[in-house]
Amino acid sequence: MKNLQCSYCGKKEPLVKRIFGGSHQAFICNECIVEFFNLLEREEENRKQKDVRSHLPKPQEIAQFLDQYVISQEKAKMALSVALYNHYKRISYPKHHHIELEKSNILLLGPSGSGKTLLAKTLARVLNIPFAMSDATALTEAGYVGEDVESILSRLLHAASFDIEKAQKGIVYIDEIDKIAKKGESVQSGRDIGGEGVQQGLLKILEGASVYVPLKGARKNSNTETVLFDTKDVLFICGGAFVGIKEERGEKRSGFLASNPSSPTQRTLRKQLLSYGMIPEFIGRIPLILELEPLNLESLVKILKEPKDSIIAQYQYLFSLDGVKLEFTDEALLAIAQKSLDEELGARGLRHILEEILMPLLFEIPSKEEVTQVSITQGFVLGNSEALILEPRREDG
């Protein structure tokens, strides 16, 4: 057949590489096939974006979800809810003319046990998106023994079951970020491979870049299988205690400080972070800085019993699997919270304390089939008395 003509664009051979024939004398060229394929891809992408938008919870709904699992830190929860909503709204809506919304990575400042990790994990649960956590203390500059920054993305890819599209819209939490502050000039230990070098290495992925990521989490080398990973839509949340940064601003904390980045409060905090050892380029890539307050006694008691998956509920479920009802008196809960407060362990210390006091019972009770109920009292928590163990009444005769 000669002089075939595309039924769609009108081009003839040899202006196009190839023309394919179909039934009813319809013909299509290779260029139109590519164009139609791209059109279908765009329509599918638009459909996915509309689907995301229709299921994207509003900030108040996100905050309500956080309230089910996270006690206290109300202002931080509000700011995080807005940040999460805006981040995924930015992803799901097409660009408007020349306006491109930049992503707002987040820095959480707060003492150990104040809820930084829990907040990050729970945010990912709101949208059921991949979540990966990394410890900054394990990171080293590329070329040195340890984990490089690409290993963070490997974890996210693994959390997404190696679905690259899902992984590229996930959340990464980097804990102990204060531990990669650069060392002082007086330190004569050679190159700062775990401090400023790591901060420099994180800059690219924080801002948004395409990097080759090892599939198995190892460092890249010539024999490592890699995949190209675009981080422009990954939300990065960094957390650190930043021990030693004192309140020098002379005003009450607002809980979230990024609403006005040029405010005296915000400027002072950023200066403190720079003095601490965070480099300007790193701080510049994290627009949203949130301060979490230390948890007080009342908050710790609430954490024990009020969240949807509270620590007390978890232990009660463990005991129920052996047919035993576990109860705590109000005084016992208060004593547990006070212990954690005295030891400055925060919410993280509650599980440690509970595990310690319940260990003898967890060891003995499964072998005592006659036990039906265990009551934990203040005296038992403080080590002054035994737990109240109830057994069914035996009938005489």
Curated annotation (Swiss-Prot):
<dbReference type="InterPro" id="IPR027417">
    <property type="entry name" value="P-loop_NTPase"/>
</dbReference>
<dbReference type="InterPro" id="IPR019489">
    <property type="entry name" value="Clp_ATPase_C"/>
</dbReference>
<dbReference type="GO" id="GO:0046983">
    <property type="term" value="F:protein dimerization activity"/>
</dbReference>
<feature type="binding site">
    <location>
        <begin position="111"/>
        <end position="118"/>
    </location>
    <ligand>
        <name>ATP</name>
    </ligand>
</feature>
<dbReference type="Pfam" id="PF10431">
    <property type="entry name" value="ClpB_D2-small"/>
</dbReference>
<dbReference type="Pfam" id="PF06689">
    <property type="entry name" value="zf-C4_ClpX"/>
</dbReference>
<feature type="binding site">
    <location>
        <position position="9"/>
    </location>
    <ligand>
        <name>Zn(2+)</name>
    </ligand>
</feature>
<dbReference type="InterPro" id="IPR050052">
    <property type="entry name" value="ATP-dep_Clp_protease_ClpX"/>
</dbReference>
<dbReference type="Pfam" id="PF07724">
    <property type="entry name" value="AAA_2"/>
</dbReference>
<keyword id="KW-0479">Metal-binding</keyword>
<dbReference type="GO" id="GO:0051082">
    <property type="term" value="F:unfolded protein binding"/>
</dbReference>
<comment type="subunit">
    <text>Component of the ClpX-ClpP complex. Forms a hexameric ring that, in the presence of ATP, binds to fourteen ClpP subunits assembled into a disk-like structure with a central cavity, resembling the structure of eukaryotic proteasomes.</text>
</comment>
<dbReference type="GO" id="GO:0140662">
    <property type="term" value="F:ATP-dependent protein folding chaperone"/>
</dbReference>
<feature type="binding site">
    <location>
        <position position="32"/>
    </location>
    <ligand>
        <name>Zn(2+)</name>
    </ligand>
</feature>
<dbReference type="GO" id="GO:0016887">
    <property type="term" value="F:ATP hydrolysis activity"/>
</dbReference>
<dbReference type="GO" id="GO:0008270">
    <property type="term" value="F:zinc ion binding"/>
</dbReference>
<feature type="binding site">
    <location>
        <position position="29"/>
    </location>
    <ligand>
        <name>Zn(2+)</name>
    </ligand>
</feature>
<comment type="similarity">
    <text>Belongs to the ClpX chaperone family.</text>
</comment>
<dbReference type="InterPro" id="IPR010603">
    <property type="entry name" value="Znf_CppX_C4"/>
</dbReference>
<dbReference type="InterPro" id="IPR038366">
    <property type="entry name" value="Znf_CppX_C4_sf"/>
</dbReference>
<keyword id="KW-0067">ATP-binding</keyword>
<protein>
    <recommendedName>
        <fullName>ATP-dependent Clp protease ATP-binding subunit ClpX 2</fullName>
    </recommendedName>
</protein>
<keyword id="KW-0862">Zinc</keyword>
<keyword id="KW-0143">Chaperone</keyword>
<feature type="binding site">
    <location>
        <position position="6"/>
    </location>
    <ligand>
        <name>Zn(2+)</name>
    </ligand>
</feature>
<dbReference type="InterPro" id="IPR004487">
    <property type="entry name" value="Clp_protease_ATP-bd_su_ClpX"/>
</dbReference>
<dbReference type="InterPro" id="IPR046425">
    <property type="entry name" value="ClpX_bact"/>
</dbReference>
<comment type="function">
    <text>ATP-dependent specificity component of the Clp protease. It directs the protease to specific substrates. Can perform chaperone functions in the absence of ClpP.</text>
</comment>
<dbReference type="GO" id="GO:0005524">
    <property type="term" value="F:ATP binding"/>
</dbReference>
<dbReference type="InterPro" id="IPR003593">
    <property type="entry name" value="AAA+_ATPase"/>
</dbReference>
<dbReference type="GO" id="GO:0051603">
    <property type="term" value="P:proteolysis involved in protein catabolic process"/>
</dbReference>
<feature type="domain" description="ClpX-type ZB">
    <location>
        <begin position="1"/>
        <end position="48"/>
    </location>
</feature>
<keyword id="KW-0547">Nucleotide-binding</keyword>
<dbReference type="InterPro" id="IPR003959">
    <property type="entry name" value="ATPase_AAA_core"/>
</dbReference>
